[in-house]
Amino acid sequence: MPFSHYAVLDGDNFYEARKLVGESDLIVLAGGHVPTQNAFFQKIRLPELLRDYGGVVLGISAGSMNMAATVYAQPEEPGESSPEYERFIPGLGLTDVNILPHYQKVKDYTVDGLRLFEEITYPDSEGNCFFVLPDGSYIYQDEERLLLCGKGYSLADGVMQQLTEDGEILNLNEE
Protein backbone atom coordinates (compact mmCIF):
# COMPACT_ATOMS: atom_id res chain seq x y z
CA MET A 1 0.00 0.00 0.00
CA PRO A 2 2.01 2.98 -1.18
CA PHE A 3 1.37 6.35 0.32
CA SER A 4 2.48 9.77 -0.76
CA HIS A 5 2.07 11.81 2.39
CA TYR A 6 2.50 11.44 6.12
CA ALA A 7 2.36 13.78 9.08
CA VAL A 8 3.49 13.56 12.68
CA LEU A 9 1.10 14.84 15.32
CA ASP A 10 2.92 15.89 18.48
CA GLY A 11 3.31 18.76 20.91
CA ASP A 12 4.53 21.10 18.16
CA ASN A 13 1.36 20.90 16.07
CA PHE A 14 -1.27 19.59 18.51
CA TYR A 15 -3.61 22.42 17.49
CA GLU A 16 -3.93 20.71 14.06
CA ALA A 17 -5.17 17.43 15.54
CA ARG A 18 -8.71 17.58 14.13
CA LYS A 19 -7.45 18.36 10.62
CA LEU A 20 -4.67 15.76 10.65
CA VAL A 21 -6.87 12.97 12.00
CA GLY A 22 -9.64 13.85 9.54
CA GLU A 23 -7.25 13.67 6.58
CA SER A 24 -5.67 10.36 7.63
CA ASP A 25 -6.31 6.88 6.30
CA LEU A 26 -3.89 5.31 8.77
CA ILE A 27 -3.00 6.44 12.28
CA VAL A 28 0.01 4.92 14.02
CA LEU A 29 0.08 5.32 17.79
CA ALA A 30 3.76 4.94 18.68
CA GLY A 31 5.35 3.81 21.91
CA GLY A 32 6.50 5.78 24.92
CA HIS A 33 5.46 6.32 28.52
CA VAL A 34 1.81 5.25 28.79
CA PRO A 35 0.49 8.00 31.12
CA THR A 36 2.43 10.74 29.29
CA GLN A 37 1.07 9.63 25.93
CA ASN A 38 -2.40 9.22 27.41
CA ALA A 39 -2.35 12.78 28.78
CA PHE A 40 -1.42 14.08 25.32
CA PHE A 41 -4.26 12.08 23.74
CA GLN A 42 -6.70 13.56 26.24
CA LYS A 43 -5.32 17.09 25.65
CA ILE A 44 -5.93 16.86 21.89
CA ARG A 45 -9.27 15.10 22.46
CA LEU A 46 -8.21 12.09 20.44
CA PRO A 47 -10.98 9.82 21.82
CA GLU A 48 -13.53 12.29 20.42
CA LEU A 49 -11.66 12.68 17.11
CA LEU A 50 -11.56 8.90 16.60
CA ARG A 51 -15.27 8.38 17.30
CA ASP A 52 -16.24 8.77 13.63
CA TYR A 53 -12.85 7.91 12.14
CA GLY A 54 -13.11 5.44 9.25
CA GLY A 55 -9.47 4.53 8.77
CA VAL A 56 -7.08 2.05 10.34
CA VAL A 57 -5.50 2.60 13.76
CA LEU A 58 -2.28 0.73 14.53
CA GLY A 59 -0.94 0.77 18.06
CA ILE A 60 2.66 -0.03 18.97
CA SER A 61 3.73 -0.60 22.58
CA ALA A 62 2.25 2.25 24.68
CA GLY A 63 0.08 3.15 21.70
CA SER A 64 -1.58 -0.27 21.79
CA MET A 65 -2.09 0.01 25.54
CA ASN A 66 -3.76 3.42 25.20
CA MET A 67 -6.25 2.07 22.64
CA ALA A 68 -8.27 0.42 25.43
CA ALA A 69 -11.39 1.97 26.94
CA THR A 70 -9.75 1.67 30.34
CA VAL A 71 -5.96 1.58 30.16
CA TYR A 72 -3.84 -0.35 32.64
CA ALA A 73 -0.78 1.89 32.97
CA GLN A 74 1.61 -0.76 34.26
CA PRO A 75 4.17 0.91 36.54
CA GLU A 76 7.57 1.35 34.92
CA GLU A 77 9.21 4.48 36.37
CA PRO A 78 10.47 5.12 39.92
CA GLY A 79 7.59 6.11 42.21
CA GLU A 80 4.94 4.41 40.09
CA SER A 81 4.57 1.46 42.47
CA SER A 82 2.99 3.90 44.93
CA PRO A 83 -0.72 3.46 45.73
CA GLU A 84 -1.18 7.11 44.66
CA TYR A 85 -0.06 6.30 41.10
CA GLU A 86 -3.16 6.02 38.91
CA ARG A 87 -2.87 2.62 37.20
CA PHE A 88 -6.29 2.53 35.52
CA ILE A 89 -6.97 5.57 33.33
CA PRO A 90 -9.47 6.43 30.59
CA GLY A 91 -8.18 5.48 27.16
CA LEU A 92 -9.20 5.93 23.54
CA GLY A 93 -12.10 3.48 23.75
CA LEU A 94 -11.18 1.55 20.59
CA THR A 95 -11.11 -1.83 22.34
CA ASP A 96 -11.74 -3.52 25.66
CA VAL A 97 -8.44 -5.42 25.34
CA ASN A 98 -5.60 -4.54 27.71
CA ILE A 99 -2.17 -5.37 26.28
CA LEU A 100 1.07 -5.61 28.23
CA PRO A 101 3.84 -5.58 25.59
CA HIS A 102 7.55 -6.50 25.68
CA TYR A 103 7.05 -9.38 28.11
CA GLN A 104 10.39 -11.02 27.32
CA LYS A 105 12.10 -7.72 28.16
CA VAL A 106 10.21 -6.60 31.29
CA LYS A 107 9.23 -9.86 32.99
CA ASP A 108 12.11 -9.65 35.46
CA TYR A 109 11.99 -5.87 36.03
CA THR A 110 11.64 -4.30 39.44
CA VAL A 111 10.02 -0.95 40.20
CA ASP A 112 10.81 0.67 43.53
CA GLY A 113 12.26 -2.63 44.75
CA LEU A 114 9.11 -4.61 43.86
CA ARG A 115 8.99 -7.34 41.20
CA LEU A 116 6.95 -5.82 38.38
CA PHE A 117 4.81 -8.84 37.61
CA GLU A 118 4.72 -10.89 40.78
CA GLU A 119 4.27 -8.02 43.26
CA ILE A 120 2.55 -5.34 41.19
CA THR A 121 0.85 -6.59 38.02
CA TYR A 122 -0.46 -9.93 39.32
CA PRO A 123 -2.36 -8.21 42.18
CA ASP A 124 -3.59 -5.52 39.76
CA SER A 125 -5.04 -8.29 37.56
CA GLU A 126 -7.66 -9.14 40.20
CA GLY A 127 -10.98 -8.57 38.43
CA ASN A 128 -9.16 -7.73 35.17
CA CYS A 129 -7.70 -9.56 32.18
CA PHE A 130 -4.43 -8.48 30.58
CA PHE A 131 -2.94 -9.98 27.42
CA VAL A 132 0.79 -10.31 27.98
CA LEU A 133 2.75 -10.31 24.73
CA PRO A 134 6.42 -10.69 23.85
CA ASP A 135 7.76 -8.63 20.95
CA GLY A 136 6.57 -9.98 17.60
CA SER A 137 3.13 -10.99 18.90
CA TYR A 138 0.06 -8.82 18.47
CA ILE A 139 -3.70 -8.52 18.75
CA TYR A 140 -5.69 -7.91 15.55
CA GLN A 141 -9.22 -6.57 15.89
CA ASP A 142 -11.85 -5.54 13.38
CA GLU A 143 -15.65 -5.50 13.42
CA GLU A 144 -15.82 -9.31 13.34
CA ARG A 145 -12.59 -10.71 14.74
CA LEU A 146 -10.36 -10.45 17.77
CA LEU A 147 -7.22 -12.48 17.12
CA LEU A 148 -4.16 -13.17 19.23
CA CYS A 149 -1.32 -13.70 16.76
CA GLY A 150 1.90 -15.27 18.00
CA LYS A 151 2.96 -16.26 21.48
CA GLY A 152 0.73 -14.79 24.16
CA TYR A 153 -0.52 -15.14 27.69
CA SER A 154 -3.55 -14.05 29.65
CA LEU A 155 -3.13 -12.67 33.15
CA ALA A 156 -6.38 -12.57 35.10
CA ASP A 157 -7.18 -12.73 38.80
CA GLY A 158 -3.52 -13.24 39.65
CA VAL A 159 -3.03 -16.22 37.31
CA MET A 160 -0.87 -16.18 34.17
CA GLN A 161 -1.74 -18.74 31.50
CA GLN A 162 -0.04 -19.29 28.14
CA LEU A 163 -2.62 -19.19 25.34
CA THR A 164 -0.52 -19.54 22.19
CA GLU A 165 2.92 -20.35 20.82
CA ASP A 166 4.90 -18.50 18.15
CA GLY A 167 3.17 -18.79 14.78
CA GLU A 168 -0.25 -19.64 16.23
CA ILE A 169 -3.43 -17.60 15.90
CA LEU A 170 -6.20 -17.77 18.49
CA ASN A 171 -9.67 -16.33 17.91
CA LEU A 172 -10.37 -14.67 21.25
CA ASN A 173 -14.06 -14.28 20.36
CA GLU A 174 -14.39 -18.06 20.67
CA GLU A 175 -12.76 -18.24 24.11
Spans of model-derived segments:
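Catalytic nucleophile loop
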Residues: 30, 51-70
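C-terminal and late-domain segments of enzyme folds
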Residues: 73-175
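Catalytic-core regions built around general acid/base machinery
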Residues: 20-23, 43-55
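General beta-strand structural signal in soluble alpha/beta enzymes
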Residues: 5-6, 28-29, 58-60, 131-133
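N-terminal beta1-alpha1 cap of cysteine-dependent amidohydrolase-like domains
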Residues: 1-26, 30, 161-168, 172-175
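Short, basic, glycine/proline-bearing loop/turn elements
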Residues: 2-3, 29-35, 98-101
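Glycine/Thr-rich phosphate-binding loops of Rossmann-like dinucleotide-binding domains
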Residues: 37-38, 68, 75
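Glycine/threonine-rich flexible loop motifs
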Residues: 34-43, 109
